[in-house]
Amino acid sequence: MKLIFLLLLFGVSPIVCQDFEDGVFLAKITSIDEHDARKIGRRFGFEAQWKLQSYTDVYVGRRLRRRKRGIEDEIVAEMMLSQQVQFIEKLQGFRRYKRAPMTNKGYPVHVWNLTPSLYIREAWEDGFNASRVTVAVVDDGVDIKHVDLKSAFSPRVSFDFVRFGDLPTPKNSKEFEHGTQCAGLVAMEGQQCGLGVGHGATLGAIKLLGQDFLNDALEGDALAFQKDLIDIYSVSWGPKDDGKSAEKPAKFTEEAIKNGALHGRNGKGNIFVWASGNGGVNGDNCAYDGYVSNEYTLSFGVIDASGAPAAYGEGCSSVLAAVSGGDAMIQTTGLESTCSSISGSSASAAIASGIISLVLDANPTLSQRDIQHLIARTSNASAIRDVELYENSAGLNFHPKVGFGLLNAQKLVVMAATWENVAPQVTCEKMNLANGIIDNSDCDVTKVERVIVSGSIIHPHRGQVQIRLESPRGTISELLPLRPKDTSRDLLDWNFVSVNFFGENSRGIWKLHVTSEEDDVDFRVEMKMFKVVGTMS
């Protein structure tokens, strides 16, 4: 058994993480039971107070008494001398931001009436309503007594990670209505505000936002919560969309997402649905968002009624598809059993989650990878306007802001109903990409799903760097676009993820093209790993 302590130092409360100035630590202690774990904690001046929810061997603890701040380093060093302590590391506090609704005006429309059509009503008419599916909205809480949500709500797949309680209700303020709005788009039952896309789904509410700071342990704990009972995690938040920030999941959270995608749902894989971001007006792009640009998440853009990508929407090479409604106020649930309206990429993640819930209702045996294959095959590229689409060698059209096109719920459920699970995933990795030329001729992946390039950019103004990846078949994917507002130094240990090569044969020579907009600047790009995942035909 492996036990992990989360040690909150000098905190006013062990639950609400308001101030990280004095440090938060994560320690892993092996081969002991819970009683011994608590004894070890007290020996080092800490007391384990409760278990984290998603790990049977993880504990939250706090100091027994005050010590001088300089003693922290001594405590860490002392604990590392113990044979039972595998590691101890300091956690950083950080903020996460809701993909807040845009200030669009107009009469609210229902989700099934969006233009261009997502063919949601047609999927319902085919008999699918997500009654066999569980969707958890990870946000600032949900009004679980709302007349349109209370029947769908399940406490078994819900938790409040802000106050560590079973009822994830939000504060009664418009500022904390976001989760309730997203939940309505997924699961509202038509009593007052309309029907959610997956109006028969079981609704989980995981309250994570609403405190001043998060940390890696809380975030990872929330995203691993009830991973064998929850099918879809709907996430409409992320790092700040200011065109300057670059953040990614920390170690514990990244492991939670990876483990869920590979092993959740009893081996079929959880589906983590992420909003691509609202930073388009700031020149932002989701390649700098490590939750969206992630091997194990599914991210979605948004288009307006004309079919053009929404001006506020962010694009990147990991965006899988898009939903409509970018210029609409979409009616949904509000606090205190009211109706409200929402737009922005927050809505896109919730709508996409609802559509995927219909797909799983059509075929509960689908894996997380099956969902990606179905979306790539059925998305409607012809609905997209005002941008140039690119075609890969497998015949799929794509664009960074819309992926493979507009989701089509009816085509998805029809294809899903008779879909046979894809073959086991094959992975090829190449290390030390010194010259940007990757010989992948010996790889068995003949149908690509994703390509991941990992490394660092050393540059005085990282926003001036552009990275493109060319496949052996000539398809070019922009892994890192220019970002004019970003004048920060360096981008370290980053994963650049692309779905643009979906269906291509990976064998042959791949080429990385790196340029800087600034002349006479010394910079380097250190790419350490090239990874392609897919199937062998």
Swiss-Prot record:
Enzyme kind, highest EC tier: hydrolase
InterPro entries: Galactose-bd-like_sf (IPR008979), Kexin/furin (IPR034182), P_dom (IPR002884), Peptidase_S8/S53_dom (IPR000209), Peptidase_S8/S53_dom_sf (IPR036852), Peptidase_S8_Asp-AS (IPR023827), Peptidase_S8_His-AS (IPR022398), Peptidase_S8_subtilisin-rel (IPR015500)
Disruption-associated phenotype: RNAi-mediated knockdown causes a reduction in fatty acid uptake. RNAi-mediated knockdown in the intestine causes a severe defect in the expulsion step of the defecation cycle.
Domain Peptidase S8 stretches: 111-413
Domain P/Homo B: 407-537
Pfam families attached to this UniProt entry: P_proprotein (PF01483), Peptidase_S8 (PF00082)
TM spans (from-to): none
Alphabetized SUPFAM superfamilies for the sequence: Galactose-binding domain-like (SSF49785), Subtilisin-like (SSF52743)
Glycosylation (residues): N129, N380
E.C. designation(s): 3.4.21.-
GO cellular component: extracellular space; Golgi membrane; trans-Golgi network
Residues of the propeptide: 18-99
Function text: Probable serine endoprotease which cleaves preproteins at paired basic amino acids. May process FMRFamide-like (flp) and neuropeptide-like protein (nlp) neuropeptides. In muscles, involved in neuronal retrograde signaling by regulating presynaptic activity and localization of synaptic vesicle fusion protein unc-13 at the neuromuscular junction (NMJ). Acts in the intestine to regulate anterior body muscle contractions (aBOC) and the expulsion steps during the defecation motor program (DMP).
UniProt-recorded name of the protein: Endoprotease aex-5
Source organism per UniProt: Caenorhabditis elegans
